[in-house]
Amino acid sequence: LWDLGQYAPEVQSIALVPVGLTGHREGLYPLRMMEPEEAADCIRIADEFGEEMLRRHGSRIAFCADELYLIAGLPLPDYSYYEDFDQLGNGVGTTALLRDEFASALSMEDGDEEKSHFSLATGEAAAPLLRELLETAKDKFPHRQLTVYGVPNITFGGGVNVTGLVCGRDIIEYLRDKPLYQGLILPEIMLRDEKDKFLDDTTPYDVAAALHTTVHVAGMDG
């Protein structure tokens, strides 16, 4: 970090992201998941560096991925910590941003007494946060229910638990015997850039047909 810090402010942003290991590593270089103590050390070092960069250049420059805080068992920083959210694509600040945007959107809603019950498939890592956010909406929408399913990633295996790498067959296998109520919502981040297929070449239609339900693909702003 300090070597890169010499090039600030030309070096504008650095993301510290734990290695993601699939279950298919035969013959590859031996890597392992970080231990909680190691993740905590990484966060401490990044924060010390960030405070100095903030003093010198007005920006922390280095930010740890949300996953590092989860591994370390430490609370995530709040919204203001992440400045311009330059590293969202690397999983840095996504939790703080989602909490802020959800609270903002909820504050502008009047609420209603309509009844509905849908299901939502997501990665295992995101499921607890989504359930937490939904609890905050109950006062305004007491009769609207959304059951969140954190889908284990069988395709990639290992420690892969992010939503964007969940495949169609993972969803089908995990939800085959579970209640889906009025339909299943899928985040579009699960789909390739063309928004028509999962990484395993299955489609939302395949999921709908296999699970005998209606599938709704929700955009990043939905």
Ranges and model annotations:
Residues 72-222:
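Radical SAM enzyme core and accessory elements
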Residues 1-27, 37-67:
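Conserved C-terminal portion of the radical SAM core fold
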Residues 1, 13-35, 119-124, 149-161:
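Conserved strand-turn element in the central/C-terminal portion of the radical SAM core barrel
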Residues 1, 29-38, 77-80, 200-202:
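Short secondary-structure boundary/capping segments
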